[in-house]
């Protein structure tokens, strides 16, 4: 193989389709916009959600629910993520933040039971699922709600 025999990967060099450049191009004259009408005009087209004057779907459906301004957002930590720590480590929210297990503290840390924990750890968090609590204690560790 020589340099002049190299070919780009199939589909990596797509040629831009220039419309409105002569009838022979297959996309001349109306440039793929059809004849007249709103969509053929410059700046033409209907707004998002417009259904030709029929009451649009988003207005036919009722409003539902509300946003709770007192909502608490917990940073989630699964048991599998706790295995990176050494036996006997005291796992605190600050340590989890430092080691990159969580990216933000939010309103606290909640430990969930996805995966298994094989180390004996002291875990301090704001909330625990009941199965996570049992799993940590079954591994010989302790659980402390902050």
UniProtKB/Swiss-Prot annotation:
Keywords: Ribonucleoprotein, Ribosomal protein, RNA-binding, rRNA-binding. Residues 21-31 have a biased composition (Gly residues). Disulfide bonds: none annotated. Pfam families: Ribosomal_L27A (PF00828). One of its GO terms (biological process) is translation. Residues 1-48 are annotated as: Disordered. Binds to the 23S rRNA. This is Large ribosomal subunit protein uL15. The keyword rRNA-binding applies. The keyword Transmembrane helix does not apply. Signal peptide: none annotated. Part of the 50S ribosomal subunit. GO terms for molecular function: rRNA binding; structural constituent of ribosome. Belongs to the universal ribosomal protein uL15 family. Transmembrane segments: none annotated. The gene is rplO.
């Amino acid at each position: 193989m020589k340099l002049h025999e190299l070919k780009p990967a199939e589909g990596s060099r797509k040629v831009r389709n220039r419309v409105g450049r002569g009838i022979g191009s297959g996309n001349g004259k109306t440039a793929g916009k059809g004849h007249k009408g709103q969509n053929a005009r410059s700046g033409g087209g209907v707004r998002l959600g417009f259904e030709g004057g029929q009451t649009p779907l988003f207005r036919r459906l009722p409003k539902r629910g509300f946003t709770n301004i007192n909502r608490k957002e917990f940073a989630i930590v699964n048991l599998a993520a706790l295995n990176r720590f050494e036996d006997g480590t005291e796992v605190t929210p600050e340590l989890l933040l430092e080691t990159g297990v969580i990216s933000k503290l939010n309103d606290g840390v909640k430990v969930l039971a996805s995966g298994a924990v094989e180390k004996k750890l002291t875990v301090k968090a704001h909330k625990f699922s009941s199965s996570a609590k049992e799993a940590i204690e079954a591994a010989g560790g302790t659980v402390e709600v902050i």
